[in-house]
Design a protein with these regions (language model features):
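Charged helix-capping and loop-helix junction motifs
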Residues: 85-86, 115-116, 152-158
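Short, solvent-exposed loop/linker segments at beta-strand-coil boundaries, enriched for Pro/Gly
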Residues: 272-276
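Short, acidic/polar
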Residues: 6-13, 113-121, 158
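Loop/turn elements at helix/coil->beta-strand transitions in domains of secreted/extracellular proteins
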Residues: 19-25, 63-69, 95-100, 125-132, ...
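Aromatic- and acid-rich polysaccharide-binding/catalytic face
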Residues: 13, 24-30, 69, 73, ...
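Active-site mouth of glycoside hydrolases
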Residues: 1-85
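Aromatic-rich peripheral "rim/lid" segments of glycoside hydrolase catalytic domains that contact
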Residues: 93, 102, 143-271, 297-338
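Active-site clefts of carbohydrate-active enzymes
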Residues: 30-43, 98-109, 121-155
Length: 339
């Protein structure tokens, strides 16, 4: 009766949060394991895991039909990884809607980051479920804080992972934001920790910036319209965003992180219609170019949240390119171009 006991435990959660709009879904089984079972990963997945997911979802639906159900694949035993991917491939559909495929990726090898995510995308398509990476980010070794070489290595594979996420247009959660701060010893490289802060307080303040500067990169948080593509280019500190606007959906919010990424200020290009800049010494935007009939009151800087807020795009129901670049805009002297 272990499955029934497990589901009964979930019932308390479903009852408590059935009307809570801030709880959008449930991660049904975290990193399911085979361990010592004498069974193949395919059989374990098809015969036990997927039917169990369906059983859990059937029990959850009477509480709320709008919640999302996050599912994961089998976390394989040490030594069983395929192409450095520790998670077994799901090859069979689940007969339910409202699914979110929520794999984990802890990949420090540059050559395997994109192939791993491509494998996950294949499963996402089969399941007809969007991807939310529930955990990512290789742990920090005890030696890393004092080694510039190790930190540069972390920066490289963290950036590559973030770029793949953004190119695919998926969300991801870095594990874990506050710790644990204690070190564990389960990797060949020695003791390691998941914490992104290096101090010993419960709520840290001393960031491991070789990690936090990557995960706190500029990105579109909320868009009135549809995102076609976006990418933050770390080398140039430039955010490129392409959207189809739809002002009927309300306001848009872009996380800039100016105090982290743009201590020299930044400039925003919105199509050919508008150029704004924000100096670290000023409270609001400076307008360098604006087409007629644009309501400049629709463009707001939220200092506390480090957000660029757009109440309405200059053109509705149209394709629009947005670019955020470092530094304050300087108009090119036409005489310099001619020379």
């Amino acid at each position: 009766n272990e499955q029934d006991i497990y589901i009964d435990a979930w019932r308390h959660v479903w009852e408590a949060f059935k009307d809570d709009d801030f709880v959008i879904g449930y991660d049904l089984v975290n990193e399911p394991r085979k361990l010592t079972m004498d069974i193949s990963y395919d059989e374990l997945t098809n015969r036990y895991l997927l039917p169990f997911y369906e059983k859990i979802i059937d029990a959850a639906l009477p509480y709320s039909k709008d919640k999302q159900f996050l599912i994961q694949s089998i976390f394989m035993n040490k030594g069983d990884a395929v192409k450095r991917n520790q998670y077994h491939e799901i090859k069979k559909k689940i007969n339910h809607k409202n699914l979110v495929f929520a794999p984990h990726i802890y990949q420090e090898n540059l050559d395997y980051i994109e192939p791993t995510m491509q494998r996950f995308e294949k499963e996402s398509t089969l399941l007809n479920a969007p991807i939310l990476v529930g955990e990512w980010g290789f742990p920090t070794f005890v030696t890393t804080d004092n080694s510039t070489t190790e930190q540069l290595n972390y920066i490289e594979f963290y950036i590559r992972t973030a770029e793949v996420f953004d190119r695919m247009g998926i969300g991801a959660i870095k594990a874990w934001f506050l710790g644990n701060r204690s070190y564990q010893n389960f990797l060949p490289g020695g003791e390691s920790t998941w914490a992104i802060f290096s101090d010993k307080q419960a709520v840290g303040t001393v960031e491991r910036k070789y990690i936090t500067d990557i995960i706190a990169r500029p990105y579109p948080q909320l868009i009135a319209g549809d995102i076609e593509q976006f990418m933050f280019h770390f080398a140039t500190r430039t955010l490129d965003l392409s959207i189809q606007t739809d002002n009927s959906r309300g306001a848009s919010k872009l996380f800039i992180g100016a105090d982290r990424h743009y201590p020299d200020g930044f400039t925003i290009h919105i199509g050919e219609q508008l150029i704004l800049s924000k100096s670290p010494l000023s409270m609001g935007f400076k307008v360098h170019h604006s087409e007629a009939n644009i309501d400049l009151g629709n463009f707001v800087w939220d200092e506390s949240r480090q957000q660029f807020v757009v109440l309405a795009w200059p053109k509705d129901k149209s394709q629009l390119s947005i670019q955020i670049k470092p530094g304050i805009y300087k108009k090119t002297d036409p005489m310099a171009k001619n020379n």
